[in-house]
Design a protein with these regions (language model features):
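An alpha-helical, amphipathic repeat domain used for nucleic-acid recognition
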Residues: 1-154
Length: 154
């Protein structure tokens, strides 16, 4: 192992142990980005292959991080965040694994999302439920959205 490869391995291990949850794409970007570590692509790829992380567990870690932020993620919204190239860049299978291996109170997540919208103001019960259930919005189920609307006083 070269010195540069060892440094890339050490850096990758540090990122992976933080518990944030990195996808392979995300870790590779972090290691090679000039705003990140700036390693050469071959050294970063070596580090990732050398460490052979459990990407499913990384997806679970990322999902837990989002769920703990109190932003209000639906199951659909969380999958979109995890798989988006502008989000985490996990595969669909890794995101679905994460969804199936996190404890998520989707009703509570809907309430968190509803509280965020109510801070912006201007929502009727109907418009809030529509926003929460919209596939271009949050993607909560009708029942989750109705529960959230009732919990924020609508």
């Amino acid at each position: 192992m070269t010195s540069a490869q060892q440094q890339a391995v050490d850096s990758a291990q540090s990122y992976l142990s933080e518990g944030q949850g990195f996808s392979e794409q995300g870790l590779l970007s972090q290691l090679t980005s000039s705003a990140g570590d700036g390693f050469l692509m071959p050294d970063a790829e070596f580090a990732i292959h050398y460490l052979n992380p459990n990407w499913d567990q990384q997806a679970v870690d990322a999902a837990n991080g989002y769920l703990n932020e109190a932003q209000g993620f639906s199951e659909q919204g969380l999958i979109q965040q995890l798989t988006s190239s502008s989000g985490n860049g996990f595969t669909q299978a890794q995101a679905e694994y994460a969804i199936n291996h996190v404890y998520a109170d989707w009703d509570a997540q809907a309430v968190d999302a509803a509280k965020g919208y109510m801070q912006m103001g201007g929502f009727s019960q109907e418009s809030l439920i529509q926003q929460l259930t919209s596939s271009s919005g949050n993607g909560f189920t009708q029942a989750q959205a109705e529960y959230a609307a009732s919990k924020v006083g609508l």
